[in-house]
Amino acid sequence: KFCYNYGELEDIPPIGEGMWEIGGTKFYEKDIDLLLSIQQKPTGIAYVYLEPFMEIEKYYSIIKKFSDAQVYQHLYTNGTLATEETLKALGEVGLDEIRFNLGASNCSDKVIENIGIAKKYIKNVGIETPMTPEFFKSFFEKKQAILGTKLDFINCAELHLNENNI
């Protein structure tokens, strides 16, 4: 309920099959090498559109390209579709950071387990989720398990409000 575009997704035009939006401009993956060779490379990239694990295999090659160019990259997920295999693959292609929206799953045991698995393969692993009353309650009920994952950070300071969720 507290995603950036809650209730507005049908109004957002699709990026386009095989395309990536970077800095407001759409690129085909095949053009990324050219982009990196002629423009100043970005200092960082955040993968924030929808749930990446629905088609995570499409992310591997693009993450690898930016990793090879030494661009810091982080990915947001609710974590429900992550597996050890996909988390390991993300680490192998060079993802620097993964941020789990633990509130989206109401502190699901499976997602907490995936946070621990991610720590084995990805450099920086954390929680970034809005601090809602429901999340606060669930978090404190499962606090020991969450902290036991050895995650690197917890960011619970934000709310993404729009006319559809207030």
Regions found by a protein language model. Name each.
Residues 10, 52, 80, 105, ...:
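Residue-level marker for beta-strand->alpha-helix junctions and adjacent short loops that shape enzyme
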Residues 36-107, 124-126:
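Conserved SAM/AdoMet-binding glycine-rich loop
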Residues 2, 65, 89, 117, ...:
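Alpha-helical scaffold elements within enzyme catalytic domains, especially in hydrolases
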Residues 9, 41-45, 163-166:
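Conserved mixed alpha/beta catalytic, RNA-binding, or beta-rich assembly cores of soluble enzyme
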Residues 1-8, 44-47, 127:
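N-terminal pre-triad scaffold of radical SAM enzymes
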Residues 28-35, 82-90, 136-144:
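Short, acidic/polar
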Residues 112-166:
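Conserved C-terminal portion of the radical SAM core fold
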